[in-house]
């Protein structure tokens, strides 16, 4: 009996199954079990939205504007859910992560620049985590910040050592750290009791009133979208088994979307709690003059006083544990992102501890120098500089992601719909425009108001403004460059595999037909 391309021989009796995918469907687990098996990548990724850099911008937004900027967090995390789902879908459909696709798509000089920028983004994201961990050790054990920074250089290696027992166990530990941090801030919020009506108004009614509201909202939005996260999410999803059938890939994409939604909802609640606590305490009518001075320039190391009136001496411990969980868990994701960036662009695979040591060694140098010379205030300013670098980096990860996920050459029949494409590009360029505005205004403001001699500022301007022009040209190039390289998707690979299986089945069936009857 002949067997067609879409047929396969199954069982001892030679029963023919008309659709290869139907055989896989017979063995499927319940949907909820398959969903649970895909939990992990979203929680790893959501840590970037809970890192010490985000905590600092949240604290300042609450202190300066109470609850008025909560809507920025809501919009930012909705956009984050969209682009993170695009990143996950890209990995699921193509079987490759973003760094690998960039390496294959772009010319040598372009992909070299993208690799260097991606590495810089990983290092810049590690600086707030190192400093935040140093502040946490300072609060918990009363050691100098620079000593805490040194300890932070090696502490994450202990957590990464869990990977030898399996990635899933490391993901469980990371998820526990997320919930520890969330629990700390929810406890804080329940104690200070911000007015619910004002919190809801701030969350759903956009307002930009008061001095500095625009700048603080830009800082909030810029701190939410991390470029290294886009490389990370597209790679983490590859650790799960993905069926090559169209239905199987859609199911997996849906699972990752739901999981990312849950993880980012937790991140939203934590960010709301941080802003609400800061806004409630710093805008209280009975605030002491000493605390009012702290609220005027709120930083990570000075924020434990927010709970002093209700928790006493234990406020520093609760806040320190939350800050430590934030710094340590965020560092793990940065290490993974750096490894995938290096492997994707250069085909170099490094051990986790070695990759962490390399990234941390580079990030710890400026953190250590600044914390020794400038103390806590200098370390806080370094966090702001690192956030500016990440804002600068964003287009060089976001634009390739938007182009690849909308390309029929990369995604085939699974490419984004015209509505998702339009919505993603509009939101993407809004974020990019905001980041460029934030970066340029900060640079121009610094040039106009620093204490350097006039001729030094002129030289800085001569160097910086051509670089800014080059930056804009690079963004335009990435946006309008035609997508040229076509990839064979999982679905096309499966189709070829089905053809081969059908040919083998045909040969087997022919051999059976030639055998004399018993």
From Swiss-Prot:
Please name the InterPro entries in this protein's record: NRAMP_fam
* Superkingdom of this protein's organism: Eukaryota
The answer to whether keyword Ion transport applies is yes
**Per its record, how is this protein called by name?**
Metal transporter Nramp1
Q: Which family does it belong to?
A: Belongs to the NRAMP (TC 2.A.55) family.
Its annotated function is as follows:
Probable metal transporter that may participate in the control of iron homeostasis.
Q: Which GO terms describe its biological process?
A: iron ion transmembrane transport; manganese ion transport
Gene Ontology MF terms in the entry: cadmium ion transmembrane transporter activity; iron ion transmembrane transporter activity; manganese ion transmembrane transporter activity
UniProt KW keywords: Ion transport, Iron, Iron transport, Membrane, Transmembrane, Transmembrane helix, Transport
Q: Is the keyword NAD assigned to this protein?
A: no
Q: Where are the transmembrane segments?
A: 35-55, 68-88, 107-127, 131-151, 172-192, 218-238, 255-275, 315-337, 357-377, 382-402, 418-438, 458-478
Which residues are the signal sequence here?
Answer: none
Q: Which GO terms describe its cellular component?
A: plasma membrane
Where it sits in the cell: the answer is: Membrane
Pfam families, A to Z: Nramp
Q: How does it sit in the membrane?
A: Multi-pass membrane protein
């Amino acid at each position: 009996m002949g067997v067609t391309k879409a047929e396969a021989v199954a069982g001892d009796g030679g029963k023919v199954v008309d659709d290869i995918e139907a055989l896989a469907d017979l063995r499927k687990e319940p949907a909820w079990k398959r969903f649970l098996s895909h939990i992990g990548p979203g929680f790893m990724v959501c840590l970037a939205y809970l890192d010490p850099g985000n905590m600092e911008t949240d604290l300042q937004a609450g202190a300066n504007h109470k609850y008025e900027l909560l809507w920025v967090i809501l919009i930012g995390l909705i956009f984050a859910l969209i682009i993170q789902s695009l990143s996950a879908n890209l990995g699921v459909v193509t079987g490759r992560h973003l760094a690998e696709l960039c390496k294959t798509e772009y010319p040598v000089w372009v992909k070299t620049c993208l690799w260097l920028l991606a590495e810089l983004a990983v290092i810049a994201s590690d600086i707030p985590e190192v400093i935040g961990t140093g502040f946490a050790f300072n609060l918990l054990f009363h050691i100098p910040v620079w000593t805490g920074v040194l300890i932070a250089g090696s502490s994450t290696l202990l957590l990464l050592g869990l990977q030898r027992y399996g990635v899933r166990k490391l993901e469980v530990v990371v998820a526990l750290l997320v919930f520890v941090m969330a629990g700390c801030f929810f406890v804080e919020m329940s104690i200070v009791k911000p007015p619910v009506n004002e919190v809801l108004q701030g969350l759903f009614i956009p307002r930009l009133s008061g001095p500095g509201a625009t700048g603080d909202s830009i800082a909030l939005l810029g701190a939410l979208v991390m470029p290294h996260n886009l490389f990370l999410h597209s790679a983490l999803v590859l650790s799960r088994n993905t069926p090559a059938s169209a239905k199987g890939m859609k199911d997996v994409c849906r699972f990752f979307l739901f999981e990312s939604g849950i993880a980012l909802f937790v991140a939203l609640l934590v960010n709301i709690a941080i802003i609400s606590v800061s806004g409630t305490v710093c805008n209280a009518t009975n605030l002491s003059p000493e605390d009012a001075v702290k609220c005027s320039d709120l930083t990570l190391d000075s924020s434990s006083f927010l709970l002093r009136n209700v928790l006493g001496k234990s406020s520093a411990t609760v806040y320190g544990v939350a800050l430590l969980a934030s710094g340590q868990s965020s560092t793990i994701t940065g290490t993974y992102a750096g490894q995938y960036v290096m492997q994707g662009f250069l085909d170099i695979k490094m051990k986790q501890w070695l990759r962490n040591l390399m990234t941390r060694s580079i990030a710890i140098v400026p953190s250590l120098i600044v914390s020794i010379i400038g103390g806590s205030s200098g370390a806080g300013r370094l966090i702001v500089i690192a956030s500016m670098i990440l804002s600068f980096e964003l287009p060089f990860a976001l634009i390739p992601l938007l182009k690849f996920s909308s390309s029929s050459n990369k995604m085939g029949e699974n490419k984004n719909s015209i509505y998702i494409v339009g919505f993603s590009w509009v939101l993407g360029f809004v974020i990019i425009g905001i980041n460029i505005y934030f970066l340029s205004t900060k640079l121009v403001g610094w040039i106009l108001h620093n204490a350097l001699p006039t001729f030094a500022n002129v030289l800085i301007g001569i160097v910086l403004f051509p670089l800014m022009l080059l930056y804009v040209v690079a963004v335009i190039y990435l946006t309008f460059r035609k997508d040229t390289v076509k990839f064979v998707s999982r679905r096309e690979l499966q189709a070829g595999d089905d053809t081969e299986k059908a040919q083998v089945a045909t040969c087997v069936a022919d051999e059976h037909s030639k055998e004399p009857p018993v």
